[in-house]
A protein has these predicted regions:
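Single conserved hydrophobic/aromatic residue that forms the stacking wall/gate
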Residues: 1-5
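Active-site loops and adjacent core secondary-structure elements that bind or stabilize anionic groups
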Residues: 8
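Conserved beta-strand in the GNAT
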Residues: 30, 35-44, 48-56
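A short, internal acetyl-CoA/4′-phosphopantetheine-binding micro-motif in the GNAT/acyltransferase core
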Residues: 55-62, 90
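Conserved acetyl-CoA pyrophosphate-binding loop and the N-cap/start of the following alpha-helix
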Residues: 61-73
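Conserved GNAT acetyl-CoA-binding A-motif
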Residues: 77-91
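Conserved catalytic-core motifs of GNAT/GCN5-like acyltransferases
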Residues: 86-88, 100, 105-126
Length: 139
């Protein structure tokens, strides 16, 4: 990756130019607990909306609460400046339940997002991602 982020971040978004675009327009946070455990990029969307563009946890630390802790850090640090925290993800049985457990609810869908914006098919749990599902939670 051009920014030296390593494989952790790329695991969550295989299209490197998309990651670079997020980084050019956003702010990156790293959760370091005796080594990097989780990374997240947020951007100022519009109309008091803060958006998580990508969040990635080192595989051996997944399921240990690091991503949830990073989301709560963002909520606590931005609630005075924004009213909504938003995230877009593929319609996946892995990610949607995670965000719902973190207090997000489904907001809207962008049809064919992964088809139109990625140069190759993206699969998660054996399912090809097609639409972008947006979820939101109040700050």
């Amino acid at each position: 990756m051009s920014r030296g982020l390593g494989d952790v971040y790329k695991r969550q978004d295989e299209q490197e130019d998309m990651v670079d675009r997020y980084l050019d327009n956003g702010k990156m946070y790293v959760l370091d607990d005796n080594g990097v455990k989780c990374e997240c990029v947020i951007t100022d969307k519009e109309n008091d909306i803060l958006e998580i563009k990508n969040i990635a946890t080192v595989p051996e630390y997944q399921g240990k609460g690091y991503a949830r802790a990073l989301i709560e850090f963002i909520v606590n640090n931005y609630r005075e400046q924004y009213t909504i925290l938003q995230v877009g993800t593929g319609d996946s049985p892995l990610t949607i339940p995670f965000y719902e457990k973190c207090g997000f609810v489904r907001s809207h869908i962008i049809s064919n997002f992964f088809i139109d914006n990625y140069d190759h098919p993206i699969y998660e749990s054996g399912i090809q991602l097609v639409d972008m599902v947006y979820l939101q939670r109040p700050l």
